[in-house]
């Protein structure tokens, strides 16, 4: 994904929701866009999928999987991009789980025999095959998100956008969904663009983008971003617990090796350090 000089202003506003931002997402990578509520994150998701069209600017480029987004290529882009939204109930259209997953395939005139094979395969991938005859409204929040993900997988996207898709789940449910997404990414060679205000979720990414008031403040690895406390504060975000503790230890002149990059590794390292004292 390549984005250049992207801006967007809603009709009822004089202030751009997205203001001249540029970034790229490497194929097969996991990139997370972070920012507080109202920073423009969800607007960017809708611009990438062609749900919204950017302000008219000859310098603006949105390129997904080698296709530049225009009014003529909008549907080609949408075939390559799937969005999992915050509330899966808003995405359900089928009476049963299998009907809902098949909906996108029906719109693409996929044959019934092929459709059945695809639905079976994607439900198996998200561990929801036993619920294929169930009504979506009776599923748990995590199960609903799994079905929503299956519906996206069915159309064979190159890019999956997670738009605050775990924000309504408890910590355990959130961890399971993120682990599932990572497994699916590795299995299917997917590119993941995660949009969140949850800093702990952002740690999983290879690349982070920090957005504030529609402007891109910084991009880099999670390590590079989280070690910049001034940047995090200016964006109105909080550091994950690991980086809070690590930064305080560094201030006290306690050396923390680069390979210590998680809470588990930090606890182990400090225990080893303590045993040597």
Label for each model-derived stretch:
Residues 34-36:
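The feature captures the beta-strand-to-loop junction immediately N-terminal to the Walker
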Residues 49:
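Helix-to-loop junction immediately C-terminal to a conserved catalytic motif
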Residues 57-68, 77:
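Conserved ABC transporter NBD signature motif
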Residues 113-131:
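Conserved ABC ATPase "signature" region
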Residues 135-139, 143:
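Conserved ABC ATPase signature
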Residues 160-163:
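Catalytic Walker B motif of ABC-type/P-loop ATPase nucleotide-binding domains
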């Amino acid at each position: 994904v390549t984005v250049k000089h992207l801006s967007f202003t809603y009709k009822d506003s004089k202030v751009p929701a997205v203001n001249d931002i540029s970034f790229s997402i490497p194929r097969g990578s996991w990139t997370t866009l972070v920012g507080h509520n109202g920073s423009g994150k969800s607007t960017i998701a809708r611009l990438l999928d062609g749900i919204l069209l950017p302000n008219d600017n000859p310098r603006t480029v949105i390129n997904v999987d080698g296709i530049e987004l225009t009014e003529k290529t909008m549907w080609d882009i949408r075939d390559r991009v799937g969005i999992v939204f915050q509330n899966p109930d808003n995405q359900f259209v089928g009476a049963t789980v299998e009907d809902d997953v098949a909906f996108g395939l029906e719109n693409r005139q996929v044959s019934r025999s092929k459709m059945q094979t695809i639905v079976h395969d994607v439900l198996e991938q998200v561990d929801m095959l036993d619920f294929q005859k169930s009504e979506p409204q009776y599923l748990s929040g995590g199960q609903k998100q799994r079905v929503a993900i299956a519906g996206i997988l069915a159309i064979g996207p190159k890019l999956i956008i997670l738009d605050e898709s775990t924000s309504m789940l408890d910590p355990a449910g959130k961890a399971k969904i993120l682990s599932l997404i990572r497994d699916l990414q590795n299995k299917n060679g997917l590119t993941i663009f995660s949009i969140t205000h949850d800093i702990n979720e952002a740690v999983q990414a290879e690349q982070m983008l920090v957005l504030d008031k529609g402007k891109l403040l910084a991009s880099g690895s999670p390590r590079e971003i989280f070690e910049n406390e001034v940047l995090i504060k200016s964006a109105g975000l909080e550091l994950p617990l690991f980086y809070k503790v690590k930064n305080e230890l560094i201030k006290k002149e306690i050396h923390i090796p680069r390979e210590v990059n998680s809470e588990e590794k930090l606890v182990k390292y400090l225990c080893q350090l303590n045993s040597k004292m």
